[in-house]
């Protein structure tokens, strides 16, 4: 059996992406009213999370998703594993495969780590474990893009034809890359707004419009996705000061007033309140930040189902 993976948002067809969004809604409905939030969908499956970067939302939501589906979830961190003794990622992956893991969920600072993991653990008669990319360097974060798309669909009633403005540190953002690819697949119009220094080389080849003027883009926006400036990936010199960046690219009360009443504000977290987004905006009725977190659990349930069981019987399994 060839294992199913989720390594990049661009690997998803339109039909697969929509099926995952639909399955996420089904799993959410299947849990409504249950005193014990448990579905038998993945009983007997072992899911291992491998987080080599700090995380709250993604790590916790994957763990909750697995447990709500009755999987056995094992957490592996760099500090608590043989990696701290010098073991390579490849040897760790092969060890987990030999131990019987059905799925490996990886977050790693190196771009391409998830695809390497899938290659390293493949090639045996059983096909190896499924690999899910929970964020690799500045490359991709496909489950974040899926939960963002689900949130937009829930708030706006659909994605196709919607104008989504992504603002901030595009250069270092795996969230931006995955959202661009997935939203394009689902028929949205994507606009990137950032200073020239925070745009990647080759962005002209992406299926997007690029702007440096946030005020000009907000009135026509259906959704605005604000990104954190990733100072941990910078050596300085990308913009003059935090104050100037916030003045030019922060979503303030004044800028929120430029949005249509239907528009939704998103942020993948963690938020730098007062820098890229004002606290009053983050806590407003137009903000879907907490809805994104809730959707993250349901999307990751759907993704685990997709890679471990398959899409064809999601409705039957989800309702079990």
UniProtKB/Swiss-Prot annotation:
It catalyses: carbamoyl phosphate + L-aspartate = N-carbamoyl-L-aspartate + phosphate + H(+). It is an enzyme of class 2 (transferase). L-aspartate binds at residues 85, 174, 228. Pathway: Pyrimidine metabolism; UMP biosynthesis via de novo pathway; (S)-dihydroorotate from bicarbonate: step 2/3. InterPro entries: Asp/Orn_carbamoyltranf_P-bd (IPR006132), Asp/Orn_carbamoylTrfase (IPR006130), Asp/Orn_carbamoylTrfase_sf (IPR036901), Asp_carbamoyltransf (IPR002082), Asp_carbamoyltransf_Asp/Orn-bd (IPR006131). GO terms for cellular component: cytosol. The keyword RNA-binding does not apply. Carbamoyl phosphate binds at residues 57-58, 107, 141, 144, 269-270. Its EC number is 2.1.3.2. GO terms for molecular function: amino acid binding; aspartate carbamoyltransferase activity. Keywords: Pyrimidine biosynthesis, Transferase. GO terms for biological process: 'de novo' pyrimidine nucleobase biosynthetic process; 'de novo' UMP biosynthetic process; amino acid metabolic process. Catalyzes the condensation of carbamoyl phosphate and aspartate to form carbamoyl aspartate and inorganic phosphate, the committed step in the de novo pyrimidine nucleotide biosynthesis pathway. NCBIfam families: asp_carb_tr, PRK00856.1. Heterododecamer (2C3:3R2) of six catalytic PyrB chains organized as two trimers (C3), and six regulatory PyrI chains organized as three dimers (R2). Belongs to the aspartate/ornithine carbamoyltransferase superfamily. ATCase family. This is Aspartate carbamoyltransferase catalytic subunit. It comes from Mycobacterium marinum (strain ATCC BAA-535 / M). The gene is pyrB.
